[in-house]
Design a protein with these regions (language model features):
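A short beta-strand signature within small-molecule sensing/ligand-binding domains used
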Residues: 101-110
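Glycine-centered tight beta-turn/hairpin loop motif at sheet-sheet or coil-to-beta transitions
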Residues: 99-102, 116
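Extracytoplasmic/periplasmic sensory segments of membrane signal-transduction proteins
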Residues: 1-92
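Solvent-exposed, extracytoplasmic
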Residues: 27-50, 78-94, 112-168
Length: 173
């Protein structure tokens, strides 16, 4: 299930990397023309993806767009080693990581136009759809993040902790 989720997230992120509006935004350094709310709403309605976050980062490591907050314009590459790696290598990266908000699946795909590197698009998905699939098979999963990450998770998506272990799936019982 994890590999399937990563592959699906990667495929969706690749599709976004081909978006002409996205490429124009990056060429003109104008994140205001990017809006993926309809895409996210459609995926929530028509797929198991219920909580998708999208971030667009220019070639200099500056966030032009985030779907889950209005914050943008910061040099995200200063604090995200994975972003630094992709900006340098210009190759896609798939990972599972724990950050400020949650334990997530992250896919970062480089964006090119006429072989010119413009930046990256990142899709972040969560463990809830996997938990839902397991529940449908009468398995009650609890995805825990080690308590050593408690101070790092400053805006927890689920807001649920058990003995300082963060619970990453909303439907944990």
């Amino acid at each position: 299930m994890i590999t399937s989720k990563q592959n699906d997230t990667n495929a969706l992120t690749y599709l976004l990397s081909q978006d002409i509006v996205l490429k124009n935004a990056m060429k003109n350094n104008d994140g205001s023309i990017i809006d993926y709310s309809n895409v996210i709403d459609g995926l929530q309605t028509k797929s198991l993806f219920k909580n998708i976050w999208i971030q667009v980062i220019d070639k200099d490591g500056i966030s032009l767009y985030r779907s889950w907050t209005k914050k943008h314009g910061d040099k995200i590459s200063k604090v995200r080693l994975d972003i630094q790696e992709v900006l340098k290598s210009q190759k896609e990266l798939l990972s599972i990581s724990t950050g400020k908000f949650d334990m997530t699946f992250k896919t970062i795909v480089p964006i090119f136009e006429d072989k010119k590197f413009l930046g990256v698009v990142e899709m972040i998905t969560h463990f809830n759809s996997i938990a839902k699939k397991l529940k449908s098979k009468n398995i009650d999963p609890v995805f825990l993040v080690d308590k050593s990450y408690k101070e790092k998770i400053i805006h927890p998506l689920t807001k649920l902790f058990i003995d300082n272990y963060y619970v990453a799936n909303k439907n944990a019982s």
